[in-house]
């Protein structure tokens, strides 16, 4: 039997079982756990497109029509990196969704084929490439529409939050308040190759105005201290959410004016909600908002400005906070408010709580202290920093960091999808889900994707000079592709809405072009449902020293003086 060397095989068909890859310039290594292309019975039946390759008529390309089961697109020899595994496979796309994960080819002449290539099948060659689910950013201030392209080029394909543009309320809070504003934002969503969902304003002590917003289509309600997150508002907002199966996101009371963290916890009465700022630099009860990490009904997330903790983190935060929350540095009380939120001890503990799987999600807080294009970068920077400072996690080996990688990718993919009731559509690479997929060169993983697919069609890519004779000459930069134009935009993306809004006929009333998908199964979600990130420690925060303990363990780490995934990738 003919043989081929492991390196030569990897260079031709991509890595297989036992091969390892470094993620960008981090210290994180992944090892391929399984190879679904071996369903043919072993090596030798791989498919590959190109001159002299196998995807040709009568070879790995069958005669079958798309109606007879041939795929619209096949992504060949991809290394899938997802919460459920790190595996080599071919990925079949049909009708804008993931139709199959396995072995592609021509079943008439090849064994083990479960993904049919036909004359009507496009090929995206993923040999040597990593494929992930599109990222989900659940903390968006919709301050400017240009955020959407910035997020898409970073590998984010779903954005959830609130706002109406550069209004003062939107600078500070993620709320799209009232049915008229909600309708305008839903109509605007039709223009973008991005899945979008909007939060209404949840700060009210009576339910009528909240029901009005849910009926207009918001996927959840945001409680923000700048609008008054009182115990009465918390309880009322959760009452409405329980009745309508939408999420509640909370930014709690930094100043402890209307109650302390204990009062906020009590006001929830055990009902589920998302703690958008689980560390206080972003906002929330000072100094002990981290207490909610130990509560089973709080789904904790971080925003990216404090992630990971570096030598520059503290210095940049005061000015950011003054701008975002409409504060005046000439007013002593405003300055004290800002400084009360910025504590190096709790910021350092946040890094470790992510590594322990106690904080479940990552998000941006776009243009409101966070950077919309850096959710993915900062997630992996923290994973790298924690490996350097804390060593291997249980389940990892000297050869690989597979468990740590699965824990961290879940923070911006499947877990926000579960928390916001959209995991039936997006959040992972699984059969039946919307084909929002991101293709990366391993050397650029987490930083600069090569191709971003929306609904199974390429919407954005790193593309060279359009006047060049080939696609690769400089200047190479991100350019919208055909999936970002015309009717393809509406077909390739979803707008998430409430069940009540969908039932009320908002698609027709507002004249919406995109497919609407209702959020669901939200109110039963608990911390235990956060994949790889469901650790529920007993939290203690010293009110004088701000030192943080989880199950008695002191959580402290040094700030990073340098990080991977930074300057060397952004020379141009």
From Swiss-Prot:
Modified residue annotations for N6-carboxylysine: 222
Enzyme kind, highest EC tier: hydrolase
Residue intervals passing through the bilayer: none
Location of the Urease domain: 134-572
Catalytic activity, reaction form: urea + 2 H2O + H(+) = hydrogencarbonate + 2 NH4(+)
Top-level division of the source organism's lineage: Bacteria
Cofactor comment text: Binds 2 nickel ions per subunit.
Entry comment on modification after translation: Carboxylation allows a single lysine to coordinate two nickel ions.
Cofactor(s) the record lists: Ni cation
Binding positions for substrate per the UniProt entry: 224
Family matches, as InterPro entries: Amidohydro-rel (IPR006680), Metal-dep_hydrolase_composite (IPR011059), Metal_Hydrolase (IPR032466), Urease_alpha_N_dom (IPR011612), Urease_alpha_subunit (IPR050112), Urease_AS (IPR017950), Urease_asu (IPR005848), Urease_asu_c (IPR017951)
SUPFAM superfamilies linked: Composite domain of metallo-dependent hydrolases (SSF51338), Metallo-dependent hydrolases (SSF51556)
GO terms, biological process: urea catabolic process
Description of how the protein assembles with itself and partners: Heterotrimer of UreA (gamma), UreB (beta) and UreC (alpha) subunits. Three heterotrimers associate to form the active enzyme.
Family, per entry: Belongs to the metallo-dependent hydrolases superfamily. Urease alpha subunit family.
Protein name (database record): Urease subunit alpha
Organism field: Polaromonas naphthalenivorans (strain CJ2)
Gene: ureC
